[in-house]
């Protein structure tokens, strides 16, 4: 027997319970694993002599403690609880440690201690450290601080203090001071650390009757000492640690350490909290701490006395020299720590945890600590809890670096790995990773290799092209030279043939040319130049350009250098220009002819005009050719000069081609604005800081960095960089480098990433970087846009200010800084090995493309220029984002204001563009307008943009045109009316049909734009006049201001009225037009007085509007807007010029609007609401609608006072209003040609007939939203019936009257009759044969011989006088007429045979239909539409599945999905043995052929042998080439079942259901979602469930039931003896003989049973089911012809797969019957009748 060595570490582990109790007394917690790790691995590395087995030496422990408590990054806060516990064990050793601890030495005290004796003077008191006078009672000379049982509330006071050198407060007694000085003078002053250590071991002085509440320390022999907080400590703690709101865990750990080591009093705790926490944080901590107070029962209490006693908010009177006072203080600290922990717990936010990802250079252990800290901070879960280990492990895997996470996911047996195992694996992967230097070297090497390969490939292709062209050119030269020789010599002369040994040079025999002595040797001379075209003259990529004359154009966004060839009929492109058209042309060249294709039309914008051209694509041509076709369109001129040919435009300018967006096209037509001559010399030199050319990049010095707030639910988005061409990357590289040098771009690492888009600048090869920030914009909070509206911005510019300065700020957004917390939002990917950049870059300034950038910059610039506006009130300063306009009344004021503005902009840090500046001019361009002399014009560039657009061919092109022209609508009178035919074509889903009306509107808009007048700038000091006119629902007007005796137009306004207003009479439409245009004009007038002039006296209409036309809401709106006399006034009635909308010199004929409206009555002028004296009839109408037994019944009636004239039931669901309209309409129809008084109690019917009917008709029976009104058909019928009576009076009466007047009696009778009629059975509206419809005329019946034979068999009689047969009293309809009638009815309804038969029987047709039922059946069966949609009723008999003859020979396979799955398992691969029913199931992560093959070879084959047959559905994992190849190699017959026929795989499909049902029950019973763990139990049930023969799969396979133990039988002796191996073998032999063979015979007998085949034969036409139908798609497709059949499946023409018979139905082919058809002819007055197939 050996002996074990006891070490301090092993001793603590053996008494681990005591160690945890001691740690708990210190208010800390320790873990055994970390205890061992720190003792054996961490602390020995500190270099203080700590052994790996631990020690109880206090000197070594204190040195380790000083290392642990080191401030800054060198400290180890996580090790504080463990070293504190070690110190407590060593300082006050428990019994099992005392034999290993050396005895303590008694040292004299050197530190200040508590007064030990009574003092004659009271101690001084301070606000921070109060003094307490305890009650006089006997106490021991040595106060016992620690109890004998080592209670948990006292050990907290035994911690060592930090090494503070400050001395405690001196005694207030002078004698005491002298005595202390004497004592200290005798002993040399040691270091502060030694003083503190010795002080803990010195005996205490005599008892004191007065104690001070100072931070306490327990020295040697129970002596109490005080060590106050120093201001430097508090300062360092506050500044070297994050705030509580930022990182509550770290600050809580600091406070816990301070409470443990410094032992502060109640006042010190308040000082500490007040320093480290804000007021709100402190209140929250105190509240949470008071919630943690526990009562006597150990549960949290809310009793105020207990809460205040344990955790007081005011200074308590605790005496710290007594155990009771110190226990109160310890409890207070514990509650304070609990409050800190509870207050620091953030709301649950798993998104924050998910956002913690591993950094590129972060170790897995450090990442795990950050992840655990996030769990503690943002979730209520403890990451150290074993129950949460799975969640933490998954987060660790998924949020690790991609390279580490992917490898961790592929670990074998992942679910059995602990978190420590995953960290160790991650550490291995991390340590083997590629360093940044190695990665950069690899990228550089790969780039060089790729570039070398590309260069070698280019050179090889170049050589190959040179050789090919050399051969072609040689052939061409040989052909030319031979032709020339033939022409000179007049015939063909061949070179004489040489002999085998004859020299080709000297023609002598005996040697060859290479050995000829007469052949000159030496270096070869220069090649003679030829005038013919050689290979060196050909142009291509990387070669010299074509010879002169040449011109470079941009085609398809790429510059192409053309050779100007006036001999070429068509222009030619050699490179692939994009899509080619179907047209082609035959090109004849020197080497033969060939056909080439044309390109599609290319739109080219030139300074000379717009050209749309199609080029000829000839790849074999040496150069791109500019032929006569394009030269003609360009109107090019070729001048031959001494230096060569020059190609210019019609005006002598060089030809240039640009491609740009249509919104910027007007810039092409603008004349270049040259900077002022004085700008370069004076303005640039005087204000260098204001210009971008001299001052560099701007920076708004007064604006703080911007913080971009995100939406609450936003998460980082990462989009990969789009592929970028080499040319584009080189184009934006200088811009990226420039922005990096200026500090606008900086490298970063961010979870956000958006792609960078290179945009080519028009007409150049330069690119500019544009970032796609659409996804970022979706996740950023929206702010209200405050950017000024260009529509009314110039309204603030008075016409008196006619000197202007326009400044365009350069890179305006880059002047605003971004806060560092918001910079990661705009990160993008950029790699440049040459610059050493490979990663992400982000913006430090406000980026372009961000949705809030214009608003943020506009607001910032407005704030910065606010002082300038105040200091210069005489100047007008307009700002639209980065475009600034300064206006003054004189040139001098403009110059002075411009200087002040430039100085201000330079001081503020903004930079203007000197190239675009317009300084002190009387005519400037601003926001696309031309400003001059107080007026604004459309620039010619804007006009040319609209004029140059081609005729739109798509809705998008039309919207572009209307948008461009709509910008100029203020200059176009009646723009809304002109563009009215165009707007309907822009709607989505509308057919784009460009007709004459659209072409006319298109031309009118262009023509109006050419004649656009100059508009005056609004002068807000003068009143405005608005001339309004209305025509056909369109409001038109012109806003003017007086300029002397003239009226100067300010804006032309136009708008379309809404559908309700468009249906009013003309005078009311004028009111609506004035209201609409007044609202639009208010945007320009800014609330200034407005005088309205119109051809109608509308003021009286507005004050007293007619109630029958306007609703109350609309009337109130109009009156509130137009009767505001302070702002709106009405002028006299004027006649307007329809062209200019200005008043005519002569006055028009006046009219009274109120009189006209009064005359505008209903549809019938003589309609009245007073009874007619000489009426022929006086009737009463009523409609009724009510609910009875859950069904709405309705009826209508017309009565007199005493009798019912008409009453009828209406269809179910009819409303009361509709019934009233029907009753009134019926009365008017019956009184046709007579004088009628009709009474109705319906306000709706009365108002419709008198008022609203005409209003509805005028506006097209539409509501204000443009929808159809209710009861449209009934209203139209009523309006039509109003004209039937000779005279008419519709009178309204009260309903449900009780009097005895004639009116009351008639109304009651009408109401009663309507209710009685409603109760009756309503007419069947679904009846197909309508009685009112015109029937067939029997005289036109034509009977065939077959019809006559059937009629004679029926016994029908022939009516000689009428010419038709009669049967059962009805005319007999011939078979052909019956077929046409029933076929038409079926095409209207597509009802089935039974329903159509029932409706025909119910309809009581006046004719007897010959062979009706048979014809009806044929019509329903032969309908193609019904065959494609209706479901099939055909049923196929059940088939028989083929089974194996023994276990393991025939398997069925299937995948089934089981969600949710842990560890990535979400599929289940199921194998079923068809013979025994034995089930094997394997959880998988993917549904692939690789998984199927792997399980087949590794699981099925080793255990059951090689299968002979496999059956499965047509899933991709089974039909894959991998699966089929494995089956072919192994000789397995793989049978694929019919698609969408689960019954074909019925056995495995049924077992899938059984397994999933069992798993569901097991998960519910076990309370877990890990179905993989419960799968064996589900398989056990499936394998032991009896089959159709009463045997379980286990019994069939093993010959006995599974071994079970009866736990209820106490006698286990019978189960202890197991049978021998021989007995098992005999049993299996018996099973094979007695079970397997009969079972196989039973399966074979089922196969021999006859199967009822399907009715389809070869050659039949069938419809095939469409299994995946889309919206409104027919259910069946076809018909198809059957090619092959089996008892259960078919193969049809056009579909490669076999189709199960249950998925088809027969297609009935209707016979071709001759019938008459009507066809159109070229002559509109003629039609053609043909007889043929229907």
Curated annotation (Swiss-Prot):
Motif (LYPX(n)L motif): 128-132
GO biological process, one term: symbiont entry into host cell
Zn finger (HHCC-type) location: 1386-1426
SUPFAM superfamilies, sorted: Acid proteases, DNA/RNA polymerases, Retroviral matrix proteins, Retrovirus capsid protein, N-terminal core domain, Retrovirus zinc finger-like domains, Ribonuclease H-like
Lipidation (N-myristoyl glycine): 2
Region called Interaction with host UBE2I, residue ranges: 429-434
Protein biosynthesis among keywords: no
Spans annotated as Disordered: 112-217, 433-498, 512-551
List of residues binding Mg(2+) 1: 808, 882-883
GO MF annotation terms: aspartic-type endopeptidase activity; DNA binding; DNA-directed DNA polymerase activity; RNA binding; RNA-directed DNA polymerase activity; RNA-DNA hybrid ribonuclease activity; structural constituent of virion; zinc ion binding
Domain Integrase catalytic, chain residue ranges per copy: 1443-1601
Protein name: Gag-pol polyprotein
Organism listed in the record: Murine leukemia virus (strain BM5 eco)
